[in-house]
Amino acid sequence: MRRIARAFLRRCRVSEPVAGLVVLAVSELVTNAVVHGEGEVVLRITVGVDVVRVSVTDHNPAPAVLKEAGPDGESGRGIRLVDAISDAWDSSGEETWCEFQDARAAA
C-alpha cells in the first residue's frame, strides 16, 4: 500500500517531504482500519492544488479516537501520530481522513 501511495504521489508531483508524511499517514490509517475496522477497507488519496487528502473507510461505525498509549503499549499511537503530522484530521466513524498542505512547484 505504501509503495502504491508513494508512486501515485510522485506522479502527482507532491513534494517529497509532504509525500513522506502522507505515506506514513496511509500506513497508520490503513493499519488502524484493518485492526479495528470491519469489512472492506478503502483508501482514497486526493491531490488538489495545494492539499493532499487521505481518506480510509471501513464498516466500523465507531470513530477513531486519540488514545494515550503507555510506554510499554504495543498499540494506541497511530491516530496520535496522524494528529501530530497532518494539518487536519477527523473521523466520522466509517471514514477517517487527514489533510496535508503542499505548496508544489508548478509543473
Model-derived segments and spans:
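Generic alpha-helical structural signal
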Residues: 2-3, 83
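Conserved beta-strand-loop-beta-strand hairpin that lines the nucleotide-binding pocket
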Residues: 34-107
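Conserved short strand/loop->alpha-helix "switch" segment adjacent to the catalytic nucleotide/phosphoryl-transfer site
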Residues: 3-27
